[in-house]
């Protein structure tokens, strides 16, 4: 639902709008696009123009949750690892890493360098595969108890 115009969007349209206009940080040049959906009041098809600003406001809650999760994780990170992260930065992977402006947003909230992994859509799978290959070397790290 596009709340300012009470427009109901289909799943595919929502995904298209997200890919075209979503950002976690203000862009140098804001963009606009026509969006077609169903008017919630009349039930009739309707076309509205929306912007990256409106879409950014619409996704603010999940983006803030991502930023909060990163900060909580950093707060719970052992000091030695935190120092390494401060030096090397945060590496984003997965589909969310492709959200425009997410590195800038996380840098602004953490003060740390933030980068997107090469080929972020496959980085998680590749890293999981590498972990399985190196399991004997990594098992003590992977299964260290928080209660030690």
Where are these regions (language model features)?
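Flexible, glycine/charged-enriched surface loops at secondary-structure junctions
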Residues: 7-14, 76-85
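Long, charge-dense, solvent-exposed interaction surfaces that engage phosphate-rich ligands
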Residues: 8-44
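Adenine-nucleotide phosphate-binding core of ATP-dependent small-molecule kinases
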Residues: 29, 33-82, 121-124
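Glycine-rich phosphate-binding loops at beta-strand->alpha-helix junctions
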Residues: 22, 26, 82-106
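Interdomain boundary/hinge elements
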Residues: 6-12, 118-120, 142-144
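Short, small-residue-biased leader/transition segments that mark boundaries at the very start
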Residues: 2-3, 67
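Conserved phosphate-binding/catalytic loops in two-lobed NTP-binding clefts
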Residues: 104-130, 138, 145-146
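Residue-level signature of catalytic and energy-coupling elements of molecular machines
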Residues: 17, 70, 92, 128
């Amino acid at each position: 639902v596009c709340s300012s115009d009470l427009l109901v969007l289909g799943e595919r349209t929502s995904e298209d709008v997200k890919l075209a206009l979503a950002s976690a940080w203000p862009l140098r040049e804001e963009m606009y696009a026509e969006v077609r959906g169903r008017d919630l009041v009349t039930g009739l098809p309707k076309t509205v123009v929306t912007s990256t600003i409106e879409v950014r406001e619409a996704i603010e809650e999940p983006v803030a949750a991502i930023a909060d999760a990163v900060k909580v994780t950093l707060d719970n990170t052992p000091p030695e690892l935190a120092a390494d992260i401060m030096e090397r930065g945060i590496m984003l992977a997965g589909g969310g890493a492709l959200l425009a402006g997410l590195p800038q947003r996380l840098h602004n909230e953490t003060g740390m360098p933030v980068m997107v992994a090469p080929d972020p859509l496959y980085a998680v799978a590749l890293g999981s595969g590498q972990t399985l290959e190196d399991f004997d070397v990594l098992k003590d790290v992977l299964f260290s108890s928080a209660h030690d």
